[in-house]
Amino acid sequence: MRIEGVITQSGEIQIDGYICKDDLKIATSFKLDTGFIGYDVAIPADIAQKLSLRPSRDEEFITAAGRSRFPVGDDTYLCLGSNMYKVSYMIYYNPFTLISITFLRQISEIVIIDFINNNIIIVLK
């Protein structure tokens, strides 16, 4: 199973996948974020609303704008290829879905990550 993505002109890595809850499945491009710590994914508020996510609590984060509270939870899944992973998330007000590098490192099915001509290819077992 291969998952393909791109390296943007600004040097960001994006991979395609789905966020799933119950029977709902929304396609999105995930930006790989090396500084995003504590949760597996950061989901834009509009996607969270479409999936009817039910965050379990609010948590305080320090952002460039100062301290802010964001809803967090774990009632959703991330689908990469044909594999599904339960994820913890925060909901935030940004148009980009973020995926934590720490989360990707924990996926035991990842065999190879290769970079070719501004493309990224992730091979899963």
Residue ranges and their predicted role:
Residues 1-125:
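Pepsin/retropepsin-fold aspartyl endopeptidases
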